Curated annotation (Swiss-Prot):
Listed transmembrane segments: 23-43
Cofactor(s) in the UniProt record: Zn(2+)
Phylogenetic placement of the source organism: Bacteria, Pseudomonadati, Pseudomonadota, Gammaproteobacteria, Enterobacterales
Protein name per Swiss-Prot or TrEMBL: Uncharacterized metalloprotease BUsg_310
CDD domains, A to Z: M23_peptidase
Length: 415
């Protein structure tokens, strides 16, 4: 019996042992599974945050790249200056920030002196930042301004090509044209020399042995030469004619004594009954309308004098202007004469300044006898009272100082 109990006890202990071992193994497996699951969760969580951080950095990088690309985009604005334009007005219309305009002008105040016919080209980004500006002072001079951080730097003031000097000697049994041709000048170059200095000398009275020194800008890319200066030695007298920034020629002291383009003395003889006004109340219609000229009170039949030389392009009747004349000058401007009694010229006829072209009257839409007079420059009406300054060949005091400074280079090469 005791033996039987022993066997049963051993069997029970063996089953208990195995069950215990099995339970422990299961517990260990469960713990391992939990630990592994926890590691995977942490890894996944870490990966999630890493991916999120990378995604944010990628988005930020993409945003900065797009911003950079956006800033790279720019607009080019070009403009040829006419009466009434300023650098500030042009840059504002081009979308340039006010601060940039002020900084640019502070660097070079001469930008406020841009004259009619000069060209400006500017590059502006999408945020209104001025990137670059070119000022074409003349056919042979330009200034370049470039953005540098938050300000601007003056880059260059240059001749585009190279200078070419030639000498012309007046020989016996010859004249200027023949001598210049023998010196290698073509017809166009010879004519440019004549126009540059004819207001100082008489080409028919040049003496044998007289010598011309001329300097041209040789534009390689355009296969063209531009006259910059002329010097003449004639009977121990020296004459100079240097091209200025406005394209006109002046002597070594900055003066040009050539004849004025428009004879304003005729206009000054009569009272202005109605001035130039872009918002005038019309005395006939009683509506606000542009008055693009001046009215000169004068009796009917008063001789109307051509204030400039040129060609008649219109001589006809209009129900508002009455009998009127348009006279075009080769130097880019036109003068108009309205409400005439009688026209004394024909279309196509060439007229000299001071020549009688009509009789004043009271035709068209008027309230009384007068002459309506207009001046147009580059297809734009200007105030005739201010035109005397605009069309003047003379330099202002500040322009003359600028000319004397800039002409030194050409003068030194002519001597």
């Amino acid at each position: 019996m005791q033996q039987i109990y022993k066997i049963i006890f051993l069997s029970f202990n063996q089953d208990f042992f195995y069950k215990t071992i099995k339970i422990l193994i299961n517990i260990i497996l469960i713990v391992i599974f939990i630990l592994l699951s926890s590691c995977n969760f942490l890894t996944d969580k870490k990966a999630f945050f890493l991916n999120k951080e990378f995604s944010q950095k990628e988005k930020e990088f993409k945003r900065l790249k797009e911003k950079k690309e956006y800033l790279k985009k720019h607009t080019i604005h070009k403009h040829i200056f006419s009466y009434g334009n300023t650098i500030s007005i042009f840059l504002k219309k081009s979308g340039v920030k006010i601060n940039d305009i002020l900084k640019l002008i502070k660097i070079d105040k001469n930008l406020n002196n841009i004259t009619i016919g000069q060209k400006i080209v500017c590059k502006v980004d999408n945020l209104g930042n001025l990137i670059k500006l070119k000022w074409y002072i003349s056919k042979f001079q330009k200034k370049i301004y470039k953005r540098y951080k938050n300000t601007f730097k003056f880059i260059k003031y240059t001749y585009d090509s190279f200078l070419e000097k030639k000498s012309i000697y007046i020989k016996k049994n010859s004249n200027f044209f023949k001598s210049a041709y023998q010196s290698g000048l073509n017809k166009s170059e010879i004519n440019s020399v004549i126009k540059a200095i004819e207001w100082q000398i008489n080409f028919n009275k040049l003496h044998i042995g007289s010598k011309f020194n001329v300097i041209f800008l040789n534009q390689k890319t355009k296969n063209k030469k531009i006259l910059l200066g002329v010097k003449l030695d004639n009977l121990d007298r020296k004459y100079f004619s240097i091209r200025a920034f406005n394209g006109k020629f002046y002597d070594s002291d900055g003066f040009n004594k050539s004849e004025e383009l428009i004879n304003f003395s005729f206009l000054k003889k009569y009272r202005i009954s109605s001035p130039f006004n872009l918002r005038r109340v019309n005395p006939v219609t009683h509506r606000i309308s542009r008055h693009l000229g001046i009215d000169l009170a004068m009796p009917q039949g008063t001789p109307v004098i051509a204030t400039s030389s040129g060609k008649i392009i219109k001589a006809q009747f209009n129900k508002i202007a009455g009998f009127y004349i348009s006279l075009k000058n080769k130097n880019y401007y036109t003068t108009r004469y309205m409400h005439l009694k009688k026209i004394l010229v024909k279309v196509g006829q060439k007229i000299k300044k001071g020549e009688k072209i009509a009789l004043s009257g009271n035709t068209g839409r008027t309230t009384g006898p007068h002459l309506h007079y207009e001046i147009w420059i580059n297809h734009r009406a200007i105030n005739p009272i201010k035109a005397e300054y605009i069309l003047s060949t003379q330099l202002t005091k500040s322009e003359r100082i600028k000319y004397l400074k800039e002409s030194k280079n050409i003068l030194s090469k002519l001597k």
